[in-house]
Every structure is written in C-alpha cells, then in structure tokens.
Amino acid sequence: MAIPQFFLLLVSLFHHAFAQDFPIGVTSPLATSCGPDNANVVCLDRYASVLPYHFFRRFSGGSTDISFAQTNVPHDTSFDLVGNADFLVFDQERGLELLGSNPTYDKVFNVSEAVHEAPVYVPSLNKLFLSILAPPAGVLQPQLVVDLNQDPPTLSEYFSDPPVYAPNGGTFYNGLIYWGASGGNRSIGGIEQVPGIQTLDPHTNKTKTLLNNYYGLYFNCVDDLIVDKTGAIWFTDPQYSWFNRLVETPPQLLTASYRFDPKTGAVTMIDDTIVQPNGIAMSPDGKHIYITETGAVTGSIVRGGPPGSPFNQTGPRAIYKFDLIDGGTHVTNKRPIWYAQDWVPDGIKMAANGDIITGSGPGVDIIDPYGVLIARIQTDYIVQNIAFVGEELTEMWLVGQGGISRVRWNLKGQDLAAI
C-alpha cells in the first residue's frame, strides 16, 4: 500500500524537530547527584558542552547576574539539580578528589550588602581578619574578625591604631597583615589617608604606612596584594575607589599593576594592559603571577559623573597568567587562561597544588593552572574574596556582599606563613 505523501511529510517534520531538541552528542541526564552521600554535589556530563535545544541563558547587565545554574534547559529536567547544588563538579576525577570524602558548605554569618574584602588568616591567633567597604567617602567603617577558637566561630568588630580606611586586599607575611588600603580622605577619624599599602601587627593592633603615592600622585585604589619570598609587594591599582566614592579625587594614574620594594621604597610598574586589574596571586613555585581582570565592571572617571560601576557582560573579565623574569622582578608572556563564566573573577588565591581559586559572582570557581574549570562552589551572595585557614589549610572562608561562609574539603591552600 502506498504511504500518503502528507504522512511522509509529517514524519520528516517530526524527525527534524526531534533532532533539533536532541542534537547528536547530547547525553542524558546532563546533571547527576554524585560524590559523598552527606554532601550536596552535582556532576555535569562533559561540562554540559552540548545542551538540548532550545536552551537559553538570559543576559546579565547592570547589577543583575544570571548564573549558569539559571540557564533554561527545558528538555532535560536533570539540569534543575544544578541550581540547588552546593558544589558543581565539571571534571569528575579531579573535582571529587579535591572535595574529599566529607565536603561541607555552611553559611556561617549573614552580613550587610556592603562589600566585604581582604580576608587574612593569622595562624598564631587562629583568627580571620577582614574588612568592610562602604561609601560615602570619609565614613570610617570598623573592620571584622572571626574568632576560629570558638565553636561556633564568633564575629566581632574592631578599629586598628591608627585606623585604616577601606582595606580592599590583604595577605599575611612575616607575622604581619599587609593591607591594600583603597580609600582616601582629608580627614578620616581625625587623620588624613589616601590609597596605599599598610601593615597591621595583629598582636599589638598597631598599623604602619609603607606606601601612599607614586611620585606625588595618588594611587587609584590599591586593591589586592601579595608578598614574595624577598619581601617585595606586588599589587593592583584599578579605579574602584572613585567609582564607589571611597576617595575625593578622580583617578590621576592609568590603571596598572606594580611591584614595591619596601627595603628601598622603589615602585616599578609590571603591567599596564589590563582595563581594571583586581586580584593578584603568585604560584606556589614562584614562577607565575596571576591577575584578574574585572573591566566588565567599570564606571565613569569624570568628576561629577555618576557613581557606581555597572556590569557589561561583553566587557573584559578574565584571569591572566604571567611568567616572572629579571630575577623575579618583572613579568612577561601575558596570556588569558580563564574567561569568567559568571560575573567577574574578583579575589584570587592559590591552592598548594597550584590550582586557582577565585570569587566570581555568587560562588567560587576552582581552575587548574591552564585555565580548565574543575569545580564551583555555589552561594546565595556575591563572593569577593577567600582565605584558607587552620593547621591543615583545608578549610576555606568566603566573604562578600551579604554573607560569610565556610567550606571544608580536601583541597589545601597555599601556606602564606611559610613564605
């Protein structure tokens, strides 16, 4: 019996529609619960690199962030697991290894929507020091300390002596906290400050200014910093202090990254190609510098212009890797290794094995030294920075806008106290 022509057409159309919904290469389910039974872990098949049509992730812009977990994938309901997971694993072998047998994620403190930054762990006190950044300019905010000797940990406020205005980045070296002080005003708590580098002795609460100008010009916003084994300080200088009105003076310098030698007072530029250099870290072997680019979040530098720095999804938001040269005093061979899949890569820290950990939107990405995403921690607030704590350095604290959280896993952090 002959098959009617219109029936063959319907079959062809149905086959075409099915092929569009489920292209060759799609495996189902895309997402599965995995890892230890006690943890909320979800594994993605092959990075979800082939999604069934019609999928769609809405545009992020202004102050609105649409995360990967919010991608609409109507033809694979397993993707609904992604949004509720604490840990997303993209590389199952390495991801489950770094999580270990008993990973946990806990939101320990609810805090204000102000930016929380510069977490620094002091081993001798077993305390985590961090800062609050909030406009308007000249309003001195108390800093915070998490006492890890208490169970549960406690959060308290303090002012250093003299107080430091708006520490935006911090690290630990030779018994001292090193702060990138990002704010400036003619009178803050009765003293004058501009962006620069300061130290805090956590045992005496005394602070000291190490750097506050570039040949008479104000730095824009000393954002983040690291100290190498020689005592040299590497730091970034974007323009966020002006965008957020933590300073009174519009930018006087190009955004750039620098190396400062406190033994001599000399400051040398190491890079001026990044639109808004932000986080900075050095590999455990001392061979590479990593700098995060947050140029997708940029505002107006014009006096009288609108404050704030809206997000532009198509703007630059990468992590760059550099090689150290000239006896470890300069960098070369800049190359992008990671393009943030969510918001911008902000604070950055190193694991002992060389993996990179960066706060990025509502969560933290764990990336290998070549820019391959291994796993992600998901939060309900924007994470600005992270710090490893404890004797084994396998506990990590996340700080940001609205929350302070704790992760316990198998990934060990870089031992800053050993530098």
Language-model region placement:
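Beta-rich, blade/repeat-based domains predominating
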Residues: V111-L125, P162-R186, Y214-I233, Y240-S241, ...
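Fungal secretory targeting signals
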Residues: M1-Q20
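Short loop/turn segments immediately following beta-strands, especially the blade-tip
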Residues: V146-Q150, N312, K321-T329, W409-L416
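Short, conserved, GDST-rich strand-edge loop motifs in beta-rich repeat architectures
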Residues: I66-F68, T77, S131-A137, G180-E192, ...
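Blade-edge beta-strand/turn elements of extracellular beta-propeller
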Residues: D91-N110, N149-P163, H203-G216, L254-Q276, ...
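Blade-level signature of beta-propeller repeat domains, shared across WD40, Kelch, NHL, RCC1
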Residues: N385-I419
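Beta-strand-rich domains and repeat architectures in extracellular enzymes and scaffolds
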Residues: T27-Q141
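Blade-loop segments of beta-propeller domains
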Residues: V115, I132-S187, E192-G196, T209-Y214
